[in-house]
Amino acid sequence: MFRFIIILYLVFIKQGIGEEILFENFINNPQEKWEFISDQVMGGVSDGKVEYFKEDDKSYARMTGIVSLENNGGFIQIRKKIDFSLSKEIKSIKIQVRGNNQEYFIHIRTSGTILPWQYYQAPFIASDKWETQDIKLIEFKRSGIMLAKKINPKNIKSIAIVAYGKEHEAFIDVNNIIIY
């Protein structure tokens, strides 16, 4: 019985405490898990696409497109839903990216982001070489005062990579996404 309790503890309670969770490596049918979304859903004119590649030992998603501010637009994104509960001990998201030396964002939606324009966001630069960006959850800013000031990791419902907020050409490759 004691052994059974220890196993339950290790499997269910300890998950996420100091351990890395591979959220995505773009190997197993990523096209079935990731969704491309643009501001066209709200009348904008930004346009783009996501494609999946394998290069040497890396499988990755490539998001490309044109971000336009016309018609109150200004974003393209790829988003993946989380269909499991994260540990409240999660503190950070680590992503491996390369791109066109532009600023991009990670957007997190939670069970509290009910309206389509609600999210938490944190910026990063995608240089032209593969680099790992480590973004702490405390660095994410809420999109409005109606959201909680801090993200509760247990409430995270999706993670998105976003080209946002200014007119530019988006070109970003995303390899691994790790939550820890």
Where are these regions (language model features)?
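Positively charged, low-complexity intrinsically disordered regions
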Residues: F4, Q15-G16
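Sec-dependent signal peptide recognition
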Residues: M1-Y9
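Beta-rich carbohydrate-recognition modules and glycan-binding surfaces
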Residues: G16-Y180
